[in-house]
Swiss-Prot record:
GO terms for cellular component: cytoplasm. The active site is at residue 300. The keyword Thylakoid does not apply. Disulfide bonds: none annotated. Monomer. It is an enzyme of class 2 (transferase). One of its GO terms (molecular function) is S-adenosylmethionine-dependent methyltransferase activity. It catalyses: cytidine(2498) in 23S rRNA + S-adenosyl-L-methionine = 2'-O-methylcytidine(2498) in 23S rRNA + S-adenosyl-L-homocysteine + H(+). Belongs to the class I-like SAM-binding methyltransferase superfamily. RNA methyltransferase RlmE family. RlmM subfamily. GO terms for biological process: methylation; rRNA processing. Keywords: Cytoplasm, Methyltransferase, rRNA processing, S-adenosyl-L-methionine, Transferase. The gene is rlmM. Catalyzes the 2'-O-methylation at nucleotide C2498 in 23S rRNA. This is Ribosomal RNA large subunit methyltransferase M.
Length: 353
């Protein structure tokens, strides 16, 4: 049980390997990362006993950028029949767990296994409960079974408060038919990712003011309007008429990189296709000058060296805000609905009393 399995978006396995390898080096956890292209997962194999557990103890999952989910454990080969008996034998070396998730990888093979997992979960859960291997206790580790095929599974453990909030790290969001574009789901997922659900009524409250830079046709604006915020939509392109009819949207035809609000707003959101360095400078201006209280901004990534680019951009943003004397929390994640991009959440911190 000394490997770390990390789920990711297909095509970003190299970024996961670079990111977890960098953290392991900093923490002096010996091992190596490996992955196959477009397999939707990577594995960090630790050379020392307890290495995977130490990595998960020392790192906060919320602080990782490219992994969607993680678990410590090992791959196990399964027979064509009597799979549950073999699993119970291996799980005898695992602690009693408080919850169970059956997961697949975000690949064509993974999608084909989804039906198998749904059917297999019922008898497996029953067997685990009968043998005392599974209790209903959120304080205990979660048992994560990631099936790479019907004959191979990763038996993993993760702490519920230090792993993904959803199986495979994929939120089950429904596309609202009224929204003018599917990009609307990126902003909704960002809120789920970065803002505790119990804080939504306070931090995403009706009547708040918001600016959407590069708004047309209004996918992100729709989310803001759906929370009954007053929105300034900045874009030279046309906005969906349904949003304009809401009475909550002012359409300003201007360059999103030039526009500045007359007074500070509660929220700024931005999903403009632009070089990430220019977008990072925009973040520094808006948060550094106090033009908004919170922001969700997408950074478009190059084709190569994407982990290194994200690290440089985050360092630049943090250094730039610090130089302006602004106290701002900065978080970054590649969301499920992101493509060749990552999403940043920034929040100005209250001045010390």
């Amino acid at each position: 049980m000394n490997s770390l399995l990390l789920h990711c978006r297909p095509g970003f396995e190299g970024e996961v390997c670079a990111e977890i390898g960098e953290h392991a080096g900093r923490l002096n956890v010996a091992g190596y990362a490996r992955a196959k292209p477009n397999s939707a997962h990577a594995e960090f194999v630790c050379s020392e006993p307890g290495g995977a557990e130490r990595l998960m103890r020392e790192l906060r999952f919320a602080g990782l950028v490219f992994p969607r989910q993680w678990a410590r454990g090992a791959f196990v080969e399964l027979p064509e029949s009597e799979r549950i008996g073999v699993l119970l034998e291996h799980l005898a070396a695992y602690p009693v767990c408080g919850s169970l998730w059956l997961e697949v990888l975000d690949s064509n093979e993974g999608k084909e296994l989804s039906t198998f997992c749904r059917k297999f979960e019922v008898p497996l859960r029953k067997a685990l409960g009968k043998t005392g291997r599974l209790l209903d206790d959120p304080r205990r580790p979660r048992l994560l079974l990631t099936f790479r095929s019907g004959r191979e599974v990763f038996l993993g453990l993760a702490e519920p408060d230090n792993s993904a909030a959803w199986p495979m790290g994929i939120p089950r969001l429904k596309f609202p038919r009224e929204a003018p574009s599917r990009s609307t789901l990126k902003l909704e997922e960002a809120w789920h990712q970065f803002i505790p659900r119990e804080a939504w009524d306070l931090r995403l409250a009706p009547g708040m003011s918001a600016v959407d830079l590069g708004a047309a046709p209004g996918g992100w604006t729709w989310q803001l309007v759906n929370r009954h915020m007053k929105v300034t939509a900045v874009d030279n392109g046309p906005m969906a008429q349904s949003l304009m009819d809401s009475g909550l949207v002012e359409h300003v035809r201007a360059d999103g990189f030039v526009f500045r609000p007359r007074r500070p707003v509660d929220w700024m959101v931005c999903d403009i296709v632009e070089k990430p360095a220019r977008t990072a400078a925009l973040i520094e201006t808006w948060l550094g000058e106090g033009l908004c209280r919170e922001a969700v901004v997408n950074l478009k990534l190059p084709m190569k060296q994407r982990h290194a680019e994200v690290r440089r951009l985050l360092e630049r943003i943090r250094d730039g805000l610090s130089a302006r004397g602004a106290k701002v929390s900065v978080a970054c994640r590649q969301l499920y609905h992101d493509r060749e991009e990552v999403t940043c959440h920034l929040c100005r911190l209250p001045a010390p009393a």
